[in-house]
Amino acid sequence: MSYTRRIERVHTKERVVAMTFDDGPMDLPSSPDKFGGRALTDLLLDTLQEYHALGTFDVVGDTSENYPDMAGKSGQADWGGVRYDHYPDINQDGRGGVVHNDRLVRRILHEGHQITNHGYRHVLFGKKPFVYGKRDHFHGLDPVVADLTRLHTLLQETYGYTMTMGRPPHYVDKIEGGFTSYDAYDQMGYLYLAAAFDGAGWLPIHHNTVQESLQAEIAAMVEPMKRALEADPDALVGQIIFQKDGYNMSRRTPVAFGLKQQLELLQSYGYRVVTVEQLMADYSPFADVGREEPGFEKLVALQKTRGIVFSDNRLRLDDPMTWGELAMLLAPRAEAIGRRVAKIR
């Protein structure tokens, strides 16, 4: 059992999904720019508004502290920086993140969208040698929590908004000292924002021309979703869909064009698009138990203060409880978290 649960989907029979948008907000235009210089985040918000959809924006604070650095190779994982990430791009940090985009943050909140914590500086929580072997990373639990707290406090003090979820940069979970992202989110009181369906658009596809590459990337956003729904109209029920609020690794923005097609497709199958917060509050906070379960409301109330759910967000009501799980159920949250941290240290 775990206080922090990885949220990828919820249990429901209704056609509803959530969409998350990572790495913004971004005050640079789409690439290629076919919208008169309008900021990418504005374009996404315009499209969501057109389809009466709500999004979950997984934002960064400011990457301008991530220097000295140099750009990597276009089309590769380190395209925006060898040592660190830079959003929306290296040497363009002043056009991205919460710190530099007050207007966009206020628009996101005013229009009813959710904001979640993707790290103030978007620094890796720990090592990821096979993809980001040259990347700097945090060394231990305390600097990870400090970085998350920095963005959390900024949203609270500037906008009166309290974030309740976070997603680790590049899904790197291991933290030096024997900790994981779950320990960091335990400290923050967060849930772990994951996803069950990749909306694509972040991975570049290379063809002879920019336009051919862009069209292939848009197709990669739309066609897998189309095939899934044609095979089973309920295939995406209750799922969280991953999206990008920024450039892909070749500095294109297929999301500026493909999001509209995705929303049209979902709407044609009768899907609503809501925030992750709404998905959990209005349908179910659990992956395996829905409102039809006897005692559902009691389980919902209990999970707010006790660790009754496993880290994969499943209750597993038919499984026998172990002594360790019983101890966690009975222990006050702060005490249990404190004991775990002290034991590892």
Sequence positions of predicted segments:
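N-terminal propeptides
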Residues: 283-345
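Active-site beta->alpha N-cap acidic-glycine motif
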Residues: 1-168, 265, 281-290
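Catalytic domains of cell-wall/extracellular-matrix polysaccharide-remodeling enzymes
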Residues: 97-100, 107, 122-267, 272, ...
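Glycine- and aromatic-rich loop/turn segments at beta-sheet edges
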Residues: 1-3, 277, 311-313
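Structured helix-beta-strand junction loops
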Residues: 51, 111-112, 188, 269, ...
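Short acidic donor-binding/metal-coordinating loop in glycosyltransferase active sites
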Residues: 21-23, 245, 317
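Conserved alpha-helical elements of sugar-nucleotide-dependent glycosyltransferases
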Residues: 36-43, 258, 295, 322, ...
